[in-house]
Amino acid sequence: MKKIVTLFVAIAAFCGFTSKAEEATTFEVNRIKYTVTGENSVGVSGLNENYEPSEVKLTEVIIPSTVENAGKNYTVTSVEEYAFRWTSGILKIELPNTVTELKNNAIYYNDDLEEIVLSENITKLGEYSLASNRKLKSLAIPAGVTEIPQSCFASDEGLTSITFASDFTSIGNGAFYKAGMAEITIPGSCKTIGNNAFQLCPNLSKVTLGEGVETLNEGAFRECAKLTEINLPASLKTIGQYAFLNDVMLSSVRIPVGVT
C-alpha cells in the first residue's frame, strides 16, 4: 500500500510540474501572444482581441525584435501557425528583422489587412502562410527565400504588385491561385513553376519568364481570363498538360525548340 501511495504522489508531482512547464511556454505582452520555441527564442502565436470598452482597438501590429517574460529576454524568430487568422480591423502587420520563418497559415484570412512588412531575413515561408488576405496590395519577397511554397499567396485577390528576389528556385502548387496581380516577371533563377501555380488569376494579362526557367507544370497558367501575352524562354524544357487551358484571350504562344 505504501508503494502505491508513493507512486501516486510521484505521478501527481510530475503532472503538476508538466502543467507548470506548459503554462510557462506561452505568455502575452501588449496583447500579442508568444510561444517559447528555444532557450532564448519565441514565436508570435496569436493576438488578444478581447478589449475593454475603454481600450482602443488595434489597427496596426508592430512586432518587437525582443520581448521579456519573467525577467528573461527572448528574441522573436518566427510567426507560428495561425498566429494571425480571421482578424478584423488590422490594417498592417510589421515583422522585425529577427524573424526568419513564417509557419503554415501564419498570416491567413484577415479581412482588412492591407500591408505586411516582412523581415529582410526571412528564409522560409510556410504553406498558406500569406494566403486569403484579400485586401493585401503589394509585397516584396525577401532575398533569403528560395522557395515559394504551396498556396502561399492563394486568394490574395487585391494583390497588385509582388516583387521577387533574384535567386529563388521554385514556385509551388497553387502558390498564386486566384491572386490579383495584372503582370508578373519571374526571374530565371526559378527553375520550376508548380501545378496550377497561377490558376484563375482574374487580372493577369502579361507574364514574363526569365531565361533559366525550365518547367511549367500541369495547369500552371490555366483559366487566366485576361492573359494576352506570355514570354517563354529558350531554357524551357517541359510544359505540363493544361498549362494554358481556357486562357481565352491568349491568341498565340511561341513554344521554344526542344520543349516536351
Model-derived features with residue positions:
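GGW-centered surface loops in extracellular recognition modules
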Residues: A24-E52
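Acidic/polar N-terminal loop/beta-strand segments that form early-domain functional surfaces
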Residues: L47, P64-T66, Y82, N105
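Positively charged n-region of N-terminal signal peptides that target proteins for export
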Residues: M1-I4
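Bacterial N-terminal signal peptides
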Residues: T6-C15
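Consensus positions within tandem repeat domains that build extended binding/scaffold surfaces
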Residues: E80-A83, K103-Y108, G126-S129, P149-C152, ...
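Structural signature of tandem-repeat unit edges
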Residues: E39, E55-S78, S88-E101, D111-K124, ...
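Sec/Tat signal peptide C-region and signal peptidase I cleavage site
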Residues: F17-E22
